[in-house]
Amino acid sequence: MIFSILEHILTHISFSVVSIVLTIYFLTLLVNLDEIIGFFDSSDKGIIITFFGITGLLLTRWIYSGHFPLSNLYESLIFLSWAFSIIHMVSYFNKKQQNKLNTITAPSVIFIQGFATSGLLNKMPQSAILVPALQSQWLMMHVSMMILGYGALLCGSLLSIALLVITFRKVGPTFWKKNIKKNFLLNELFSFDVLYYINERNSILLQQNINFSFSRNYYRYQLIQQLDFWSFRIISLGFIFLTVGILSGAVWANETWGSYWNWDPKETWAFITWTIFAIYLHIKTNRNVRGINSAIVALIGFILIWICYFGVNLLGIGLHSYGSFTSN
């Protein structure tokens, strides 16, 4: 009873804090004022509070159930939001990249945790005895590595998606070109004295517009480079976790079912996801096809992760169907 109450309190604290954090963060994006910088810093600290709240929630379920809390979809989603909060804290202590990663991690934490605690999973939050297939020391190793891999790959893929949005975003037409055309017409209509004044004025305006356009394009270029930089490193880390998770799952499958690979639906989609991100990393080693091409591959990988993560759970088939929506 005590553990249930504590779990209920920690769930509401973590979800409430991250909701407030997301609200504050969106306000700072809509109202870019220096007076609310303190609120933005407080929102980052709120994610740290959320991290400890989710950590306490996982520990409470671990103690109460007697096993590592990764036996169903609800617990895996909570663990996934915990992984995103870790990435958020890394960006918090790295002040130079703070704003870039927080844009991805803060909404991800609240959406994932909100879905986990929603009515779709009303039967999942209750801890239950593990099925015989999950009563193994490989549970913590395999599932935790897979979820950490999913979290890192999703975060890195979202950064690549942001790169695509910024790259293909159409820049509004600059009005300094129109001024050049107007200058030509004015030169034909006015006297020399008036022309001298107009040319001087328009040359100043032209220089200001060029500087503005250059600074804006330079900032976009720097932002794209930083997104590409961090996307590659986070996806590389997630790829390592995913590889370890697949290998540990193969060893576990051999001990449980007598075969390293059974072409189970989730195994198949995990292998496809692994292949896509292997292609992404291969593209990043080729300087001639970096940037947009690798970001498109990451976008495909982002879709495949959700298919792999929820596909089997929605269908309720295969060896991994014990955590599905229909299993309860």
Curated annotation (Swiss-Prot):
Signal peptide: none
A Gene Ontology cellular-component term: chloroplast thylakoid membrane
Nucleotide-binding recorded as keyword: no
Any matching Pfam family: Cytochrom_C_asm
UniProt-recorded Gene Ontology molecular function terms: heme binding
Membrane spanning stretches: 13-33, 46-66, 73-93, 101-121, 146-166, 234-254, 263-283, 295-315
Membrane topology: Multi-pass membrane protein
Keywords: Chloroplast, Cytochrome c-type biogenesis, Membrane, Plastid, Thylakoid, Transmembrane, Transmembrane helix
Alphabetized InterPro entries for the sequence: Cyt_c_assembly (IPR002541), Cyt_c_biogenesis_CcsA (IPR017562), Cyt_c_biogenesis_CcsA/CcmC (IPR045062)
Keyword field contains DNA-binding: no
Compartments where located: Plastid, Chloroplast thylakoid membrane
One of the protein's GO biological processes: cytochrome complex assembly
Family the UniProt entry places it in: Belongs to the CcmF/CycK/Ccl1/NrfE/CcsA family.
Function description: Required during biogenesis of c-type cytochromes (cytochrome c6 and cytochrome f) at the step of heme attachment.
Subunit structure, interactors included: May interact with Ccs1.
Full protein name: Cytochrome c biogenesis protein CcsA
Organism: Arabidopsis thaliana (Mouse-ear cress)
Taxonomic lineage from the root: Eukaryota, Viridiplantae, Streptophyta, Embryophyta, Tracheophyta
Gene that this polypeptide is encoded by: ccsA
